[in-house]
């Protein structure tokens, strides 16, 4: 069983108007992550947990501006939760692949110039699956020809 959790960093939500929606509740990223990931582990008992996080990694932040303080919390999430298998980050527009606190982290650049391919091999147990191995590979899309038909079909999205 695979569980996927989506998170957005505190710093990015300050400029949004989601609080105007009556069914939307905004709270601190780390608080929400701890509650929901604990709930998922206790109730759903996943074999594998992926977090998709619109925020970045402090270790690759080129600036340490005060206003970015709550934007790049991936390390904090990995360290304090410790049960995440893969965290996919976004925000800093740099390609990064690594491992911290037992969690694989990836971030795939910007403008679809690169992709990060994860290959995950599981080993079947009696009632569950166990991660046997995770490989990651950065794919440079500049090595591939553009699909002219697809470019025509998506032209309105690119304008």
Question: What are these model-derived regions, one by one?
Answer:
Residues 148-159:
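Active-site nucleophile-His-acid catalytic modules used for acyl/amide transfer and hydrolysis
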């Amino acid at each position: 069983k695979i569980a996927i959790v989506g998170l957005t960093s505190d710093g990015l939500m300050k400029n949004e108007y989601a609080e105007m929606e009556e069914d939307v509740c905004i709270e601190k990223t780390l608080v929400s992550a701890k509650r929901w990931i604990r709930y998922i582990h206790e109730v759903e008992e996943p074999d594998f947990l992926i977090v998709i996080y619109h925020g970045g990694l402090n270790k690759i932040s080129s600036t340490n501006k005060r206003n970015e303080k709550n934007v790049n919390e991936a390390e904090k999430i990995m360290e304090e939760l410790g049960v995440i298998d893969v965290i996919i980050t976004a925000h800093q527009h740099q390609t990064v692949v690594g491992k911290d606190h037992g969690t694989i982290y990836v971030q795939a650049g910007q403008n679809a110039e690169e992709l990060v391919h994860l290959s995950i091999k599981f080993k079947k147990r009696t009632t569950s699956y166990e991660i046997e191995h995770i490989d990651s590979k950065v794919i440079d899309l500049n090595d591939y020809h553009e699909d002219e038909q697809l470019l025509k079909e998506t032209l309105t999205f690119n304008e």
